[in-house]
């Protein structure tokens, strides 16, 4: 009996093989089952032969998130930009790759591309205004969009809760025209078990039924409040720490008196009635204690009501993470950090404009404030001739350090005059001129020569060398 069964199995195997070999089209069009890349971890996704790629996509709020996507075999290169929205978090991601995420929580999102001409606000007696999307405007998926204000264009009054995101277990309510984050209504507590009706527990305890018996146990304690993020952040002078978007951010003070006043972590600079700045810890019972504003907004008490208003970020705030190549600087263009080519202002002097006499002229770097277009990147400097064969370009500062003549603090200028290191020799005028006469600093800064004689632009109020 066993031999017969074995023969039957062998016949079936050979039959299957012969059918497969007889039909090569079967192998040609056969495809493996689809991979479920979105369920893999990072290590599993990056594993060899996983058939998946681990790609980053950026949300409108600037959050980079990695997704495990199926490799289409073409390298997952760039594709026409599209948008997808997360149904769980409402985050909108800009999809740049031909390999798209396949998460069950993501769906295609249609970008609002209306124009004011299409809104026809004037026809109904209103005006068209461009507003920022909530909560963020960062990528091509979240541009500004037009709304009708006034008239009968359907704009209507804007809810004060429009730009307010409340913490967990809180919801925003419009109370007398103000946005308030109030606790969500909780379901009524369950009725006590009939076995607990005759049980009276002490303070801080409650009755439960365990193993068919009533007993008193300690009431669960509420979780501790989240840490105050700004307690661990020390902002520079003229900036206060404000928490929004779940992060601590240094924002520029509104009061000019606070520009040069420095406060420790967890404290804000405020100005009293005598216009004197001092450090004060934010009131924990303030109206904004339960209000979390979207990115780019900060909560302020206006008319005794908490309101989310757009807050100016520090200059070039998004540029802090963008490193531009040499000859380029970061500037904010259309709310996005961009690398632009640095241009030399027309007033900048070169060695052709300076007569150093018997001295050598070299262009030395100038410490320009970041983003300044009115500051000369390099300035001319008169130096003693080098005793070596090296030229000035061998030194990173643009001049040679080999100065053995003189006392190191002065430069001979002709037979009579001796100039200091921070001065230039003008033989035609028979005088020494401070190098800072040839440097034009940006507003809010002044020219000061450092210990090596190189002029630099320093912010006003900074102690010079």
From Swiss-Prot:
UniProt GO cellular component terms: spore wall
Domain Follistatin-like: start-end pairs: 160-182, 195-217, 229-251, 257-280, 287-309, 318-340, 435-458
Gene Ontology BP term (one): sporulation resulting in formation of a cellular spore
Record's function text: May contribute to the structure of the coat at the interface between the middle, cellulosic layer and the outer, electron-dense, proteinaceous layer.
Record's keyword terms, sorted: Repeat, Signal, Sporulation
Signal peptide: 1-22
Domain of life: Eukaryota
UniProt-recorded name of the protein: Probable spore coat protein DDB_G0283555
Lineage summary: Eukaryota, Amoebozoa, Evosea, Eumycetozoa, Dictyostelia
Domain DSCP-N: 35-153
